[in-house]
């Protein structure tokens, strides 16, 4: 069974809005918005008032393209295994806010998310399976721009997290937790390729068995990088 509620709102000289509520397997969803101050959110929203959209099911392919400035993409209920997601943001002052299986009531395994950002002063807040492992997650970021803020939290094992960042005065805060396996092949792996100046990076890896892996390649000046790896006990923070 598949249920898709999709409402589109587009008026001359007004912002475009997409409200969506999806349940069921094998869904392919592609959404593209061109221009400024556009919204993608939940089916319970009304014009001018945003709620978060719901996606539930397995084997889902989701593509989001927001091309322009001051756009918003928001989801507080993203429950699905075997998801392939491509999120493309090209512009300034955009917002992306996603919770993926935040409560742990479902699962979020075998997901492959690709996030591409071109522009400045964007804000991204992503939490994946805070109370339940997102096993075999593959999360890739490609970022080109200045003054962006990225805050993301993942509870995972058998997973990889890659960031390619080119730009200045960006802020990245990452918190990784979970079981993280017993060998390098099933650990949580984080790789950062950083180029630019005056960037601030805070990384915390706190898996149960301390099998976290971290690699950083940096060509930067006047930047601050803080790394904490901890499987328990008392630690100082960044």
Predicted regions and their residues:
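Sec-dependent N-terminal signal peptides
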Residues: 2-12
């Amino acid at each position: 069974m598949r249920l898709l509620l999709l409402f589109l709102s587009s008026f001359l000289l007004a912002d475009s809005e997409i409200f969506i509520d999806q349940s069921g397997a094998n869904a392919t969803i592609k959404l593209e918005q061109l221009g400024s101050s556009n919204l993608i959110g939940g089916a319970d929203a009304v014009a001018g008032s945003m709620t978060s959209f719901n996606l539930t099911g397995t084997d889902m392919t989701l593509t989001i393209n927001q091309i322009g400035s001051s756009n918003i993409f928001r989801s507080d209920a993203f429950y699905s295994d075997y998801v392939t997601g491509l999120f493309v943001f090209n512009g300034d002052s955009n917002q992306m806010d996603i919770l993926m299986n935040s409560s742990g009531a479902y699962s979020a395994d075998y997901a492959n998310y690709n996030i591409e950002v071109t522009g400045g002063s964007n804000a991204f807040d992503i939490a994946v399976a805070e109370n339940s492992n997102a096993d075999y997650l593959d999360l890739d970021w490609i970022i080109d721009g200045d003054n962006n803020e990225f805050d993301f939290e993942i509870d995972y094992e058998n997973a990889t997290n890659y960031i390619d960042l080119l730009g200045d005065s960006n802020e990245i805060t990452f918190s990784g937790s979970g079981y993280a396996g017993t060998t390098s092949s099933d650990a949580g792996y984080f790789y950062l390729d950083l180029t630019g100046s005056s960037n601030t990076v805070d990384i915390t890896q706190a898996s149960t068995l301390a099998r976290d892996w971290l690699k950083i390649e940096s060509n930067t000046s006047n930047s601050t990088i803080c790394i904490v790896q901890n499987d328990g006990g008392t630690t100082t923070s960044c």
